[in-house]
Curated annotation (Swiss-Prot):
Lineage start: Eukaryota, Metazoa, Chordata, Craniata, Vertebrata
UniProt similarity note: Belongs to the cytochrome b family.
UniProt: heme b b566 binding residues: H97, H196
Binding site for a ubiquinone: H201
Xref: Gene3D superfamilies: Cytochrome Bc1 Complex, Chain C
UniProt-annotated binding residues for heme b b562: H83, H182
Record's protein name: Cytochrome b
Primary location class: mitochondrion
Encoding gene (name): MT-CYB
């Protein structure tokens, strides 16, 4: 078996990626989230496939087909809630994964980091089009508001919006194409995830100390496969608790009402994992400015390798930047809270302050703290 896995053309790839992969001996549980994201992706593709067998992407029957899945299909309610809450688990793991990358300086592996940003954007796009499919009130109005933002693009904006809608409003054509996008995008994510792994295995993993670990590597299996299995069991435990005990806690009550173009909900808001970006969008009174800020809130992650001037790798021995990092995390939580609040005083002002702080920390405070710490080392 040992010879086979090392010589067989297919098994050799698996062997180099998951069995004999040289891995730093000191990576912590924060490194588990990459494998958890892979598990989340598999859960989403499997549950999504079974949902797609019963779902109809037609405005007259979409809402009813989801109700039919929950009521008449064997374990349809479980598949639906695993899929809906699986998306939340996916984004929790994604945010922690990115947060760990920032904290431990994984962005210096620039190819892996940039493919990760593409993965992040593709996952957000998949989640957005998927949220539209149940055709509830918030699904419909969320789709209308977010797609309508493209009209802020000069010259081609209005034409682009109508082209995406497939008409003059969000209707049957929009739902059909969103279903098509939602079906194909996870497979594109899978392809990008393999590229992400390919680049990662070219350079090797980072580690908590930020030091070179070439002299202290251990095989991935059995040490980290066992460690990953523990993480997977914990992930499944939390997912099952969510799906079985609190299935609708992260959803929106407006989505229990079928989509009605003549009745606008009091507060239009996306799913919780988009609220930080939505708060940044709303904090700028100008439409085009808001759209640019929204895009930059994600794309600014690509600036981390460029703005990094530190002589040290990661934040483990850098108390000044650590303080700024945790302020950044707290600020993100504030933005998430603000995104779910109505557009009125004092929430608008808090949102504007938090949005300015978000960009200030990344563009100004982190590079400045890097320079300060570099000078402290010289003393």
């Amino acid at each position: 078996m040992k010879i086979l896995r090392k010589n067989h053309p297919l098994l050799k790839i698996v062997n180099h990626s998951f069995i004999d992969l040289p891995t730093p001996s000191n990576i912590s549980s924060w490194w588990n989230f990459g494998s958890l994201l892979g598990v989340c992706l598999m859960i989403q593709i499997l549950t999504g496939l079974f949902l797609a067998m019963h779902y109809t992407s037609d405005t007259t029957t979409a809402f009813s087909s989801v109700a039919h899945i929950c009521r008449d299909v064997n374990y349809g309610w479980l598949i639906r809630y695993l899929h809906a809450n699986g998306a939340s688990m996916f984004f929790i793991c994604l945010f922690i994964h990115v947060g760990r990358g920032i904290y431990y300086g994984s962005y210096v592996l620039s190819e892996t980091w940039n493919v990760g940003i593409i993965l992040f954007l593709t996952t957000m796009a998949t989640a957005f089009v998927g949220y539209v499919l149940p055709w509830g009130q918030m699904s419909f109005w969320g789709a209308t508001v977010i797609t309508n933002l493209l009209s802020a693009i000069p010259y081609i904006g209005s034409t682009l919006v109508e082209w995406i809608w497939g008409g003059f409003s969000v209707d049957k054509a929009t739902l059909t194409r969103f279903f098509a996008f939602h079906f194909i995008l996870p497979f594109i994510i899978t392809a990008f995830a393999l590229v992400h792994l390919l680049f990662l295995h070219e350079t090797g993993s980072n580690n908590p100390s930020g030091l070179n670990s070439d002299s202290d590597k251990i095989p991935f299996h059995p040490y980290y496969t066992i460690k990953d299995l523990l993480g997977i069991f914990l992930l499944l435990l939390v997912l099952m608790i969510l799906a079985l005990f609190f299935p609708d806690v992260l959803g929106d009550p407006d989505n229990f009402t079928p989509a009605n173009p003549l009745n606008t909900p009091a507060h239009i808001k996306p799913e919780w994992y988009f609220l930080f970006a939505y708060a940044i969008l709303r904090s700028i009174p100008n439409k085009l400015g808001g759209v640019l800020a929204l895009i930059l809130s994600i794309l600014i992650l690509a600036a981390f390798p460029l703005l990094n001037t530190s002589k040290q790798h990661g934040l483990i021995f850098r108390p000044v930047t650590q303080t700024i990092y945790w302020t950044f995390i707290a600020n993100l939580l504030v933005l998430t809270w603000i995104g779910g609040q109505p557009v009125e005083y004092p929430f608008t002002m808090i949102g504007q302050i938090a949005s300015i702080t978000y960009f200030t920390i990344i563009i100004i405070l982190m590079p400045v703290s890097n320079t300060i710490e570099n000078n402290i080392i010289k003393l």
